[in-house]
Amino acid sequence: SPIAEKIGAVNTIMVERVEGDMYFYELTGYNTDYTGFKQSLIPLINLDIHKKALILGTGGASKAVAHALSDMDIEITFVSRKTGKECISYGELTADIISSNKIIVNTTPLGTFPDTNNCPDIPYSHLTNEHLLYDLVYNPAETMFLSKGKEYGAIIKNGQEMLKLQALAAWDIWNKQ
């Protein structure tokens, strides 16, 4: 699909028989992470406040998150263990950076069961009630990342609704809805 091509990652494949030939099939790749994340995030966004976002991690899911945020005209910055031309390191996160990026999305597996006593190394003390912390992890329902955000008054959301919405999107693709 055009969105999966732009993102550069596929997590759902549609297999269709080529018309008129029973031996050939066409495969089309889709990215339902994009759909699930975007649909679950929209109700939480206040565009007067949420103009910039930090995306923790640089794996496949981070690309879908970045594309969804960009489509909502939210400026993004990737944060990774290693610096690169398109990302900063956790060590570079200052009070000013946290302050100006009101959305922080964890796309890493940090905090996932059974390693629940782990979380991204960010300066949580600079979070406020204007911040929105979104963790793609959904087990446990409240990760240490979300718990620390909640402690400072941030709006928090786990990845459970995203998971459900991406499953529905995949179902629609496979059943041509």
Predicted features by range, described:
Residues M72-I88:
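NAD(P)-binding Rossmann-fold cofactor-contacting core
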Residues N46-K52, T128-N129:
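Short helix-loop-beta connector
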Residues E86-K157:
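Rossmann-like adenosine-cofactor binding region
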Residues N31-Y34, L41, H50-S70:
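Glycine-rich adenosine-cofactor-binding loop
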Residues A53, I76, I156:
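Hydrophobic anchor at the start of a short beta-strand
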Residues S1-L44:
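Phosphate/diphosphate ligand-binding glycine-rich loop within oxidoreductases
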Residues Q39, A154-Q177:
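Active-site capping/gating segments
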Residues Q39, P43, H67-D71, S147, ...:
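Short, well-ordered alpha-helices that flank and scaffold nucleotide-derived cofactor binding pockets
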